[in-house]
Amino acid sequence: MVAKNIKYNEEARKKIQKGVKTLAEAVKVTLGPKGRHVVIDKSFGSPQVTKDGVTVAKEVELADKHENMGAQMVKEVASKTADKAGDGTTTATVLAEAIYTEGLRNVTAGANPMDLKRGIDKAVKVVVDQIKKISKPVQHHKEIAQVATISANNDAEIGNLIAEAMEKVGKNGSITVEEAKGFETVLDVVEGMNFNRGYLSSYFATNPETQECVLEDALVLIYDKKISGIKDFLPVLQQVAESGRPLLIIAEDIEGEALATLVVNRIRGGFRVCAVKAPGFGDRRKAMLEDIAILTGGQLISEELGMKLENASLAMLGKAKKVIVSKEDTTIVEGMGEKEALDARCESIKKQIEDSTSDYDKEKLQERLAKLSGGVAVIRVGAATEIEMKEKKDRVDDAQHATIAAVEEGILPGGGTALIRCIPTLEAFLPMLTNEDERIGARIVLKALSAPLKQIAANAGKEGAIIFQQVMSRSANEGYDALRDAYTDMIEAGILDPAKVTRSALESAASVAGLLLTTEALIAEIPEEKPAAAPAMPGAGMDY
């Protein structure tokens, strides 16, 4: 077992403080509209330029193992806030440093760390309740655009694109961010159910120019096994041909005699048909086929459910207003399924998302929900250079998450103003605490609430304490607009923060800072000293 280096009490806390401060100094310069960029060296390719707090935090690794523990704990604050709300990572880091620094001063002066932590936790609960009270729901397209614009570092183009995407795909829709090939940042919206499986033969294409197969008022056959022979398949094909409507076939695979028959039918000008493979794999494939069945009002023909392809009838087939199939993907527009069944399916998927512990599973479930309930929007980010594109893509990601958070829990006056407006409520709560050290813990939170505003002011080249006093003396929604160096009504000016982001930042910061304050010992491995390299042989590497 490797020997360990152990630090105790004051020495341990000083090491943690140095690690916390080092990480926080790198992260907090990015806060606010006049925050600076951080350039991160990469082992390959060009350096990364970012203003995203969690991206900066993730890159920090300190040489001193004890100091690194403090840095890693604050890194956890940024990561947890990003996981919960998708934004607010820099605010969370600033709050964590403020709570820990002030808390450490009081512990050194003799306060009981456990009582301090209890006081911090009680104060955070009071502030969170107040945040919920003062938040207001997002009601307009304009407010969504404003939240996204602020989170994208005051880029109105990104803000408007995200608001447009949210409007088109709805609350449950999926917005994905990709890199564009050109300079322009554009929005593509795919309405209806879309999956990445194209037609099995180009003979199915109905439009030779676009190489797409477009089926209007189509029937949809959904089968979970391979179709190779024609015998079992023929009865349902004959019924469809008699109905005169086009047919989309979705199955695990269609091959051999079955595929050949369908292709020959198309070449001879028979009824319009298109065959595609089922999306996904394993259990996910079955779930997606069930989704398609509910969306189109059909049934999944599955032998597991006692259904055979040879017994399939028109009543079992789904219906869609339009189906568009290209070489790469299939889109089902306006499926004719019952709204009640569709809503129940969406609720079931939402429950699975809540219960899932895997990020990958959550992402796939979210995709399914989006496809069922509204559609998928793709924002393609363009820029002149790869470095600029990556930086812009980070900002689009932040803005997207902030917007989703705003829709979930409402909005607050931004620029750190909302936390300032919670100070009077917390001051009124202090006399209710009978334990002196708990009261000190609550005062630590009280002081920390002004830290984000002061940092925004400092990054704008102003004196934080003066700006704080000015904001404190003003009415509810009035705050400091660092971009324009003016005091204004933050809601009217469109400087908004999602309530979920502010709440998550404070909760994560207080949680980790409280743990650090109650730490009395640090244990780390003693780094091994590498033996010095052997001296070079005389004359080595010389030509004679």
UniProtKB/Swiss-Prot annotation:
Annotated HAMAP family: CH60 (MF_00600)
Pfam families tied to this protein: Cpn60_TCP1
Sites where the protein binds ATP: 30-33, 51, 87-91, 415, 481-483, 497
Family designation: Belongs to the chaperonin (HSP60) family.
Function: Together with its co-chaperonin GroES, plays an essential role in assisting protein folding. The GroEL-GroES system forms a nano-cage that allows encapsulation of the non-native substrate proteins and provides a physical environment optimized to promote and accelerate protein folding.
Reaction(s) the record says it catalyses: ATP + H2O + a folded polypeptide = ADP + phosphate + an unfolded polypeptide
Cellular localization per UniProt: Cytoplasm
Gene Ontology BP annotations: protein refolding
Induction: By stress.
EC number: 5.6.1.7
Record-given protein name: Chaperonin GroEL
Organism domain of life: Bacteria
Isomerase is among the record's keywords: yes
Organism: Chlamydia muridarum (strain MoPn / Nigg)
Key words of the record: ATP-binding, Chaperone, Cytoplasm, Isomerase, Nucleotide-binding, Stress response
Cellular component terms per the entry's GO annotation: cytoplasm
PROSITE patterns named among the record's database cross-references: CHAPERONINS_CPN60
SUPFAM superfamilies named among the record's database cross-references: GroEL apical domain-like, GroEL equatorial domain-like, GroEL-intermediate domain like
Subunit structure, interactors included: Forms a cylinder of 14 subunits composed of two heptameric rings stacked back-to-back. Interacts with the co-chaperonin GroES.
Gene Ontology MF: a single term: isomerase activity
Nucleotide-binding keyword on record: yes
